[in-house]
Curated annotation (Swiss-Prot):
A single MF term (Gene Ontology): RNA endonuclease activity
SUPFAM superfamilies to which the protein is assigned, alphabetical: Metalloproteases ('zincins'), catalytic domain
InterPro entries referenced in this protein's UniProt entry, alphabetically: MetalPrtase_cat_dom_sf_prd, YbeY, YbeY_CS
Protein name, UniProt field: Endoribonuclease YbeY
Cofactor: Zn(2+)
Family classification: Belongs to the endoribonuclease YbeY family.
Enzyme class: hydrolase
Residues reported in the UniProt entry to bind Zn(2+): H148, H152, H158
Highest taxon above the source species: Bacteria
GO terms of biological process kind: rRNA processing
Length: 179
């Protein structure tokens, strides 16, 4: 049985957020302050982990269903910083909205009780631009980008339209579970 109870799951979140006071006039939506709080993100990721663990029909690595202690990193950074990471690790020029660096593999997890999933980097500037473009709140856009990065940490890829559609639909499902 792949179902687990929320109280059994633990998450160690390493959260870092740069000083974005220069954007304070653009960050006035309801709930925007939450995106800068570690406890908020910890609750979000725990919710998503528990949502995943309560279902058996997701294409995820087996270790996700066998472990109960996870950790991951989330950093909210600038366009300049994410462009540097994008160039160094993805060999792409310019900023992007979200980057994920999973550090797990099935083979290395057999005897581990605690699983380090990896790191997610989100550009606040790109999130702001996209929130205007898609007419979302910055809160919604940050949740969207975090869910996308999180699924990459769990091994999801979108190398074709079908995989991308499945991933985006699953992101929506996870986000709705937060309401």
């Amino acid at each position: 049985m792949k179902e687990k109870i929320i109280s059994e799951i633990s998450l160690d979140l390493v959260f870092q957020c740069n000083d974005f006071s220069q954007f304070s006039n653009k960050l006035k939506d309801t709930n925007t302050h939450l995106i800068f709080e570690s406890i908020f993100w910890e609750k979000v990721f725990l919710s998503w982990i528990n949502t995943i663990l309560k279902k058996e029909d997701y294409e995820l690595p087996n270790y996700i269903f066998e472990k109960k202690s996870f950790s991951l990193g989330l950093q909210i950074i600038s366009n300049q910083e994410i462009a540097s990471l994008n160039k160094k690790w993805m060999q792409k020029n310019g900023p992007t909205d979200v980057l994920s660096f999973p550090i797990i593999s099935d083979e290395s997890l057999n005897n581990l009780d605690h699983i380090e999933l990896g790191d997610i980097f989100i550009s606040l500037e790109m999130a702001l631009e996209q929130s205007y473009e898609y007419k979302n709140s910055i809160y919604r856009e940050m949740i969207w980008l975090a869910s996308h990065g999180f699924l990459h940490l769990l091994g999801w890829e979108h190398n074709n339209e079908h995989d991308l559609e499945n991933m985006l639909n699953f992101q929506e499902y996870l986000i709705k579970k937060l309401d």
